[in-house]
């Protein structure tokens, strides 16, 4: 079920998809790092990033450390935006796991299956 006012994944631009892939693969990044790795301008990345922030998929997570000047902001996936459920039904055992968007395990359980 889609939330009101939040675009579905199918309507995302290629830039938004590329940003999410980059954040998944590389972790927390600044706008400058995102722009450099995508080989596009900072304003282009800023626009796509702001759209993802507005829809709740990305959030600011702090500032980069060890900077002589003003430290740039770091962005990462909003872990609470989506959850995944994995179920493994074996012949004798059943296991399930729930994790957030960042891969942190929220719940895991295994037990012997009933016949």
PLM region descriptions:
Residues 56-61:
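A short, conserved structural fragment
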Residues 36, 53-54:
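Alpha-helical residues within the helix-turn-helix
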Residues 49-50:
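Short, hydrophobic-biased segments on the C-terminal half of alpha helices
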Residues 71-107:
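Gly/Thr-rich phosphate-binding beta-strand-loop-beta motif of the actin/hexokinase/Hsp70
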Residues 62-68:
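Short, basic, alpha-helical segments at the C-terminal edge of helix-turn-helix-like DNA-binding modules
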Residues 1-37:
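Extreme N-terminal segment that seeds HTH/winged-HTH DNA-binding domains in transcriptional regulators
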Residues 43:
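Key DNA-contact positions within bacterial/archaeal DNA-binding proteins
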Residues 108-115:
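N-terminal phosphate-binding loop and adjacent alpha-helix
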């Amino acid at each position: 079920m889609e939330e009101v006012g939040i675009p579905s994944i199918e309507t995302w631009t290629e830039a938004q998809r590329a940003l999410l892939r980059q954040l998944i693969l590389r972790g927390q990044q600044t706008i400058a790092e995102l722009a450099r790795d995508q080989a596009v301008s900072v304003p282009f990345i800023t626009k796509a990033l702001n759209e993802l922030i507005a829809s709740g998929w990305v959030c600011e997570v702090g500032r980069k450390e060890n900077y002589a000047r003003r430290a740039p902001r770091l962005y990462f996936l909003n872990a609470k935006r989506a959850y995944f459920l994995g179920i493994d039904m074996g012949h004798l055992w059943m296991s399930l796991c729930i994790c957030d968007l960042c891969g942190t395990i929220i719940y895991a359980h295994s037990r012997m299956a009933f016949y």
